[in-house]
Amino acid sequence: MSTGRHLPGGARLSSFRELYGRTPACTARAPGRVNLIGEHTDYNGGFVLPTVIPQVTTVELAQRGDRIVRVCSAEVGDDRPAEYELGREARRHAWVDYVQGITWVLAQAGHTLRGADIRIESSVPLGSGLSSSAALEIALLRAWRDACRLDIADVPLALLGQRAENDFVGAPVGVMDQMACSLAEDRVALFLDTRTLEFARIPLPPGIDLVVVNSGLSHRHAGGDYMTRRRECEEAARLLDVPQLRDLPLPRLERTIGGLPETLQRRVRHVVTENQRVLDAIAAMRAGDVALLGRLFYASHASMRHDYQVSIPEIDLLVDLARQDPRVHGARLTGGGFGGSIVALVQEGAGCDVAHRVVREYDAHSGQKATVLVPPP
């Protein structure tokens, strides 16, 4: 998720030794994630179904003898480190806020840190709806955990990452991204109940290729439309006198929401039906029913487009181009929306061909430059 601040990723960065004159004491990694289905449900206490992608964020760290943190990232474009002092973290509205947020939240949780030299490199594309910020947070937390021998299990680690992004960076994200980056596995979906944090690992059905295409249009989570959607959901829950929209039953939904303003009706309808689609998707995966899973993808996209209103014409174009190919079972916007990426279920062996055909036609029709992220080059 992008918040309008630059996150590490992309450019060539000098080695740790070239930057700091020594070798790192530890190296930690965390993957990006793609959400298969269950969009904008996490901050409503609902269900999500993400899996990891091949792109990762890598953090190298060596502790210092003082309380200074120096950090270099590939995104900055030079080797001059950002610098701050532990205990004096202050929001700068820059990429280093994610690093500061992690040391701040660790201190808030009672952990003792020393200063450190840090190098960050990432192949998770920014603003693509694939959790570049969560991958960074989890990689940083893992590095600090290893370096300082902190006793933090993977679920509490994810919660610390979410708290850093919520309370320090200022992005009102749910917990899905950090949980996925901390717990998910390749070709295994993580079914997560975001209220209870209970989870189960669901293998992807055989016979499919997963395709992820980045539209080339980034999104933002620390303000604007994303924050508006969250506030609309909170207001709808208040008016309906439920703790969260997750608590509304699907039967008689239209009668339940009939007294709300039309905009809030749309938001509630998406969240409640999307929660059911997650449960239906799990049943389809366990049954190996790829056709049903694909139909759920298309239904999810239609709901995000018409009821939650987070899609944009370029994303709709990508989904429509994918739908035209008989080898595609389903496709949808993935991530927070307002740009980002689509995820598609494709007949096994056809993923690369389908992805590159969609990109060529998209580039020709939109004037934008899309990128195939999965399958990786």
Positions of the model-derived regions?
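Short pre-catalytic strand/loop immediately N-terminal to key active-site residues, enriched for Gly-Thr
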Residues: 126-127, 329-331
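C-terminal nucleotide
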Residues: 2-33, 37, 58, 62-92, ...
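A short catalytic or substrate-binding loop motif that flags glycine-/basic-rich loops and adjacent residues
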Residues: 40-43, 51-53, 275
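FabD-like malonyl-/acyl-CoA
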Residues: 134-135, 341-345
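Structural signature of FAD isoalloxazine-binding scaffolds in flavoprotein oxidoreductases
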Residues: 46-65, 184
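Gly/Ser-rich oxyanion-binding loop with an adjacent helix/lid
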Residues: 2-28, 33, 38, 46-47, ...
